[in-house]
């Protein structure tokens, strides 16, 4: 029997990652500068998680100005007015914390997981880079992190097997002027062309407290946590009112097929469909479908394509 070793990847592209609705007791309030705050007490462990969500991602960018949201994910770790360069991670590490950041089409997130007695440290660090980052950002900072992002793109895309399809796929599903049509990491050309002032202007437009949510969950006393948050964040100046993203409805009128030549041993088939926005009718159904199709070795596609047909080595379905 002829055997074709074929990695197969199926995907359903949604506007943002899906989530389940869970009944969690919270306290929610808003500071005068517009910062949205959500608190949740959970005393099962002596730890706390601090998350800052900026309501900006690659979907807020413009053609010719791609990659700015992801670039700022890096720049925000380079120090701020009251946090010397290199000390942000150092102070958190000394406190026993784990921290990182991530960027998607619709949001940028920074988090710290740390012992609950170090909560104030995380709040101070996050408030300082929210309000006083541009005081210390220099062209050298921008150039340095621009090079880091370019190297990240080379590692994850240019030098990664099968990665070209991840960059090409959004452009096949969305019109060229739609902000979901380009990758979160941006293009090399746009990153190279961005000036120091271009990058700073993007921060001024989107990174104020009135365009952010602060979530603190874990071993906290709600009243005490609220006082700390008000102390560190109330003086952060309100930012501009950012423009609201309004995306036209997208549909595909016909099937599109694209073939890539790559230096890989095995071919890959990647099939994608547009799916409903988060929480819309059909969103949860497709999450369940993806799980049924490919989660685990007893899933339907895994059994059919790998065990029975011996046509693939890997199969993945996701929304």
Regions found by a protein language model. Name each.
Residues 154, 171, 241-298:
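His/Glu-based metal-binding/catalytic segments typifying zinc-dependent metallopeptidases
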Residues 42-44, 53-57, 80-81, 115-117, ...:
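Solvent-exposed coil/turn segments that connect beta secondary-structure elements
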Residues 21-54:
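Mature N-terminal segment immediately following signal peptide/propeptide cleavage
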Residues 1-2:
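N-terminal secretory signal peptides that target proteins for export/translocation
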Residues 37-40, 46-49, 58-62, 120, ...:
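Short, solvent-exposed loop/turn elements at domain surfaces
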Residues 30, 89-241, 259, 269, ...:
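Charge-rich, well-structured scaffold segments of protease-associated domains
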Residues 49-113, 181-185, 295-311:
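M16/MPP (pitrilysin/insulinase) zinc-metallopeptidase core fold and M16-derived inactive scaffolds
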Residues 5-15:
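Bacterial N-terminal signal peptides
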């Amino acid at each position: 029997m002829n055997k074709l070793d074929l990695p197969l990847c199926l995907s359903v592209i949604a506007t943002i990652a899906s989530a389940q609705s869970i009944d969690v007791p919270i306290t929610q309030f808003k500071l005068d500068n517009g910062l949205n705050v959500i608190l949740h007490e959970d005393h099962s462990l002596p730890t706390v998680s601090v998350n800052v969500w900026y309501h900006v991602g690659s979907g807020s960018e413009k053609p010719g100005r791609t990659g700015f949201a992801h670039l700022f994910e890096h720049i925000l770790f380079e120090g701020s007015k009251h946090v010397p360069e290199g000390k942000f991670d150092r102070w958190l590490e000394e406190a026993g914390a784990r921290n990182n950041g991530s960027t998607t089409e619709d949001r940028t997130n920074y988090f710290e997981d740390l012992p609950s007695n170090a909560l104030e440290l995380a709040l101070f660090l996050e408030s300082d880079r929210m309000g006083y980052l541009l005081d210390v950002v220099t062209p050298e900072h921008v150039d340095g992190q621009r090079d880091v992002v370019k190297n990240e793109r080379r590692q994850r895309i240019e030098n990664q097997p099968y990665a070209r399809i991840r960059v090409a796929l959004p452009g096949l599903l969305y019109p060229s002027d739609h902000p979901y049509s380009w990758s979160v990491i941006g293009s090399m050309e746009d990153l190279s062309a961005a000036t120091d002032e271009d990058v700073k202007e993007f921060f001024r437009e989107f990174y104020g407290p009135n365009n952010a949510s602060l979530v603190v969950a874990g071993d906290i006393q709600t009243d005490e946590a609220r006082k700390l948050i008000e102390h560190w964040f109330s003086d952060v100046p309100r930012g501009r009112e950012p423009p609201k993203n309004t995306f036209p409805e997208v549909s595909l009128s016909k099937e599109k097929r694209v073939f890539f030549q790559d230096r890989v041993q095995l071919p890959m088939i990647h099939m994608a469909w547009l799916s409903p926005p988060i929480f819309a009718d059909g969103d949860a159904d497709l999450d369940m479908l993806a799980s049924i199709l490919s989660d685990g070795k007893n899933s339907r596609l895994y059994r059919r394509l790998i065990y029975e047909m011996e046509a693939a080595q890997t199969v993945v379905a996701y929304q």
